[in-house]
């Protein structure tokens, strides 16, 4: 473990890789050298990052299979991203988590639709009651007995001398 974290060891490995590449490739103008160097750098970085991480994870984890599977999937996804692919490899656990999240969201939306539908039905019933109260109904005879200002008014038969006292009479003004 000390060797993996030692800076001198890392620098010696990089120097060894550079010396090996320069000995293999004698022509300094070779076109593929940057690509080969970047691939080797990525592989070396993955090697340096994944091995200690996997060792620690396997020691501390209860389920080593899931840890190894997760590390391998992460490495494959990293390589796919470096290669320019937009697709990713997923495990069944991730798919199940996404399905659970989708089902939970659908249930939440269905509950909201149910609440909204109930509110809309209540609003429609309220509007119907308001409409029914506002509709004018044709009435043949108007019942004036309920009018409070009609109590003391006498009918034509009850008036003295049969004359309406409220009817205006002719008034002559003097000049």
From Swiss-Prot:
Query: For side Lumenal, which residue ranges?
Result: 1-28
Q: What is its main location?
A: host cell
Q: Which GO terms describe its biological process?
A: monoatomic ion transmembrane transport; symbiont-mediated activation of host autophagy; viral process
* One GO MF term attached to the UniProt entry: metal ion binding
- UniProt entry tagged with the keyword Ion transport: yes
Query: Does Glycoprotein count among this protein's keywords?
Result: yes
Where, by residue number, does the polypeptide cross the bilayer? 29-51
Kindly state which keywords UniProt assigns to this record, in alphabetical order: Activation of host autophagy by virus, Calcium, Enterotoxin, Glycoprotein, Host endoplasmic reticulum, Host membrane, Host-virus interaction, Ion channel, Ion transport, Membrane, Metal-binding, Secreted, Signal-anchor, Toxin, Transmembrane, Transmembrane helix, Transport, Viral ion channel, Virulence
Question: Per UniProt, where does Ca(2+) bind?
Answer: 120, 123
Q: Which residues are glycosylated?
A: 8, 18
A GO cellular component annotated for this chain's UniProt record is: host caveola
Q: How does it sit in the membrane?
A: Single-pass type III membrane protein
Q: Which comment does the entry carry about domains? A: Binds 1 calcium ion per tetramer.
Q: How does it assemble?
A: Homotetramer. Interacts with the immature particle in the viroplasm. Interacts with host CAV1, early and late in infection. Interacts with host integrin ITGA1/ITGB1 heterodimer. Interacts with host integrin ITGA2/ITGB1 heterodimer. Interaction with microtubules blocks trafficking to the Golgi apparatus.
Q: Report the sequence similarity comment from the record.
A: Belongs to the rotavirus NSP4 family.
What HAMAP family has UniProt attached to this entry?
ROTA_NSP4
Purpose of the protein: Plays an essential role in the virus replication cycle by acting as a viroporin. Creates a pore in the host endoplasmic reticulum and as a consequence releases Ca(2+) in the cytoplasm of infected cell. In turn, high levels of cytoplasmic calcium trigger membrane trafficking and transport of viral ER-associated proteins to viroplasms, sites of viral genome replication and immature particle assembly. The secreted form acts as an enterotoxin that causes phospholipase C-dependent elevation of the intracellular calcium concentration in host intestinal mucosa cells. Increased concentration of intracellular calcium disrupts the cytoskeleton and the tight junctions, raising the paracellular permeability. Potentiates chloride ion secretion through a calcium ion-dependent signaling pathway, inducing age-dependent diarrhea.
- Which named protein is this? Non-structural glycoprotein 4
Name the source organism: Rotavirus A (strain RVA/Human/United States/D/1974/G1P1A[8])
